[in-house]
């Protein structure tokens, strides 16, 4: 293969020097021919198949401004095989399928172009980090992507992909001391090399105030930016604290007050820190007057924001606010340490920014040491300095589409490679299944239809409490707006409690709450210090019973109306939302949630505070689930909840989870939604499913894994890996949350508009005549077994997993039954499922994109 590989490298050198379009196309076609020859020496999907074969899931990678990361989860008993596979992957890699992957990057680039937010972000960061690599979008400039050099990629790999510039981060249920020798045995063979000196960039000048304007956004937006600090700087944590004085998750910051006072639609502060440099950002969206359907000016928005920023610069900082923010830091750190994935992120940051792990673990101690003088000094030093202001107006950005050459698919060899046999010969540990033990959940009932579940928290003293009412927007369409009002309202009374005061009172107790709604449920989520559970619950209950939706000049409800009006207008220009609405129309017809929701002019803009308060009170007449996770004894918790919550003794039974009526698919049908502005077309495939039966759960899983299971599934393999037609492609059957509810097959391909016909041909060939690879079943059994065994909730979600299982009729962890069924799986199960539920079934196809291509 080596001569072919060297030829591919040389051809890319030629392509980079060729400017004539016809000549370039000829070179690309020649690259494709040689790449197809080289593809015979190794399967492009072998790595993903090997990961699947050891039970690995979530195979992916990402590139940020400062680091590239490769990751997946896997069972610890396969540790040696996983270490061997990854270490071998990094030893003399051959980039034979470079052209195919580059095509996928083109698709990714074009996909981002259809989102105005991409253009806004690129414009702002291009100015904020001018002169630095941070000014460039991560995916790169179009010219770089059009003229890639494989030789430069290989040089980059040889320079930076060395063990002295690399971290291996493992978090999970394994023995550290027995794993260390395995790491030495596998990764120890990688050769260190001296690293070149990193490019030193000058700091972007912030010598005077500067102002920029651009018509790129979905709505007007103000961005104010100051020069900040790099990660690890002595002022980094204090600047983070200053940002939280402006906005935070408790909604008690100075900018939060502006939104709660209905002066702004949205405002947030953030400390953007990176390896070399950083910026301090304030983002605000103007208030929209629902009566005139106009935003307040960006000038007025800037005046409001800068008045609050100036308070910090002048040292006008409320000591009480400082202590509330400090307590919130403590809570958020403790919550972070609850989850393995967050520990991965912590270690990832420690490596990327060369920070001692011990220092990161001392965050609470370091936050405790921040003084008022520190805050005043840092606020004045950074926020009192020159700034860059960005006025983003509504507009349509120019899109520089990347053209793709017409290339033929790569056909890789099938069957087991020698490497696969080698990996299989490495001894694996023994799988010891563990299942979810629900016995520690205290289950009780206050009244018929009012259930309470208490789960112990042994990690910290932060409780979480969810009130889940059995009604949502499907039955009460205005409930969406009542929930929005609850998140911005205070409490009735004489004199009553204003919205900001209500949030501050909760924060003093270490508490916070939020309200949300779905098709079928209304949620009240409460969190806080365990010692103040009773007071926090009492305060939230008071808010639930006596919310104050009235305001001077109806500013509060007009704010909500303005948000809805603005959101509806954004929907018309956001291709992702338009596609979602089109999909729902194809699926549900006149029952689409976009059609059934309250009409903007006739209903939303006519809403009254009393009307929405009435809707909110209807919620409390429905079936209720109470989910508590905390450290207090269940008996004490139930006593607090029973006495402090206003519970209805006679509730209406829930009809949720909602099953929205669908449009039956009785014949093949294609829907077109033309949009000439789109760089990438969206293609959906829909097939009606059968009523869900949990006895078929494993068959659904097996088909989904075989047909659409990540990089190893047929869809990604045929459409992305072989043909480079799409960055995103999938296909799966969704399982219903309740026995007997309908399932459905949903497929998707995002591709250039001129590739739509080809992509549909390939996808339809998979649906009409599914390729059969029985040899993949061992991998599928392995990954499904690992998937069901590792699909465990956090302690905070444990009781909700229990009730979800109960809806499906399970009395134990479903994995206990599914592991047995997985062991019996054969390819006949997959084939039978396909023939009964897919083959020959009528299909609806939805195409959204530029019709001219």
Q: Where are each of the predicted segments found?
A:
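Carboxylate/His-rich catalytic cores and anion/metal-binding grooves
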Residues: 106-113
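Proteins synthesized as precursors that undergo proteolytic processing into mature forms
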Residues: 240, 480-484, 701
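M16 family metallopeptidases and their MPP-like homologs
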Residues: 1-88, 119-143, 165-171, 220-230, ...
């Amino acid at each position: 293969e080596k001569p072919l590989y060297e030829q591919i490298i040389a051809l890319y050198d030629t392509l980079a020097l060729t400017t004539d379009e016809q000549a370039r196309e000829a070179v690309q076609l020649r690259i494709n021919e040689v790449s197809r020859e080289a593809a015979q020496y190794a399967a492009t999907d072998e790595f993903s198949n090997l990961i699947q074969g050891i039970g690995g899931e979530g195979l992916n990678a990402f590139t940020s401004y400062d680091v590239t990361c490769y990751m997946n989860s896997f069972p610890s008993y396969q540790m040696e095989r996983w270490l061997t596979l990854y270490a071998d992957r990094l030893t003399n890699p051959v980039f034979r399928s470079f052209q195919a992957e580059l095509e996928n990057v083109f698709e990714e680039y074009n996909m981002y172009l259809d989102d105005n937010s991409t253009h806004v972000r690129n414009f702002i960061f291009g100015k904020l980090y001018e002169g630095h690599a941070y000014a460039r979008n991560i995916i790169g400039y179009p010219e770089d992507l059009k003229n890639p050099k494989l030789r430069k990629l290989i040089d980059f790999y040889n320079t930076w992909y060395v063990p002295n510039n690399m971290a291996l981060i493992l978090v999970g249920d394994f023995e550290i001391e027995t794993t260390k020798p395995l790491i030495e045995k596998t990764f120890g063979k990688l050769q260190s090399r001296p690293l070149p000196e990193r490019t030193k960039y000058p700091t972007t000048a912030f010598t005077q105030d500067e102002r920029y304007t651009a018509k790129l956004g979905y709505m007007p937006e103000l961005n104010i930016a100051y020069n900040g600090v790099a990660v690890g700087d002595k002022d980094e944590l204090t600047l983070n604290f200053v940002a939280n004085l402006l906005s935070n998750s408790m909604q008690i910051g100075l900018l939060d007050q502006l939104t709660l006072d209905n002066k702004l639609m949205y405002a947030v502060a953030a400390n953007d820190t990176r390896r070399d440099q950083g910026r301090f950002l304030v983002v605000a969206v103007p208030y929209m007057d629902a009566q005139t359907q106009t935003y307040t000016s960006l000038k007025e928005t800037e005046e409001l924001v800068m008045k609050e920023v100036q308070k910090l610069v002048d040292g006008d900082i409320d000591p009480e606010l400082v202590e509330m923010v400090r307590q919130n830091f403590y809570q958020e750190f403790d919550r972070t340490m609850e989850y393995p994935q967050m520990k991965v992120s912590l270690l990832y940051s420690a490596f990327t920014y060369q920070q001692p792990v011990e220092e990161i673990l001392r965050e609470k101690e370091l936050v405790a040491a921040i003084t008022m003088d520190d805050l005043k000094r840092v606020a004045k030093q950074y926020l009192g300095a020159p700034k860059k202001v960005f006025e983003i107006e509504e507009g349509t950005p120019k899109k520089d589409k990347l053209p793709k050459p017409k290339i033929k698919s790569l056909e890789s060899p099938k069957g087991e490679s020698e490497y696969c046999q080698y990996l299989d010969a490495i001894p694996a540990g023994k799988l010891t299944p563990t299942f979810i033990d629900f016995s520690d959940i205290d289950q009780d009932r206050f009244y018929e239809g009012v259930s309470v579940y208490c789960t112990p928290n042994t990690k910290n003293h932060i409780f979480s409490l969810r009130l889940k009412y059995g009604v949502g927007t499907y039955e009460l369409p205005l409930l969406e707006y009542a929930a929005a009002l609850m998140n911005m309202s205070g409490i009735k009374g004489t004199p009553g409690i204003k919205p900001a005061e209500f949030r501050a009172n909760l924060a003093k107790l270490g508490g916070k709450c939020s309200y949300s709604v779905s098709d079928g449920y209304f949620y009240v989520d409460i969190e806080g210090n365990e010692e103040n559970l009773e007071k926090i619950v009492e305060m939230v209950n008071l808010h639930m019973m006596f919310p104050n939706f009235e305001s001077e000049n109806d500013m509060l409800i007009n704010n909500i109306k303005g948000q809805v009006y603005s959101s509806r207008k954004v929907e018309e220009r956001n291709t992702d939302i338009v596609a979602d609405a089109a999909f729902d129309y194809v699926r549900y017809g006149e029952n689409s949630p976009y059609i059934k929701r309250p009409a903007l002019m006739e209903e939303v803009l006519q809403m009254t505070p009393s009307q929405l308060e009435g809707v909110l009170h209807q919620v409390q007449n429905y079936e209720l689930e109470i989910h508590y996770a905390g450290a207090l004894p269940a008996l004490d918790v139930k006593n607090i909840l029973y006495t402090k919550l206003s519970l209805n003794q006679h509730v209406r039974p829930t009809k949720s989870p909602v099953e929205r009526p669908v449009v039956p698919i009785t014949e093949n049908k294609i829907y077109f939604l033309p949009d000439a502005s789109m760089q990438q077309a969206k293609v959906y495939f829909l097939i009606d499913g059968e009523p869900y039966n949990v006895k078929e759960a494993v068959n659904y899983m097996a088909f989904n894994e075989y047909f659409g299971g990540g990089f190893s599934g047929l869809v990604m393999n045929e459409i992305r890996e072989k043909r480079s037609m799409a960055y995103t492609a999938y296909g799966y059957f969704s399982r219903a949350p309740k026995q007997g509810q309908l399932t459905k097959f949903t497929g998707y391909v995002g591709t250039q508009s001129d590739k739509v016909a080809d992509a549909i041909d390939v996808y339809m060939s998979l649906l009409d005549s599914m390729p059969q690879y029985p040899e993949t079943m061992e991998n599928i059994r392995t990954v499904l077994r690992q998937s069901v065994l590792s699909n465990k909730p956090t302690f905070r979600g444990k009781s909700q997993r229990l009730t979800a299982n109960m809806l499906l009729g399970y009395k134990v962890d479903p994995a206990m039954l599914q592991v047995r069924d997985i062991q019996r799986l054969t390819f006949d199960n997959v084939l039978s499922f396909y023939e009964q539920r897919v083959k020959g079934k009528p299909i609806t196809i939805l195409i959204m994109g530029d019709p001219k291509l």
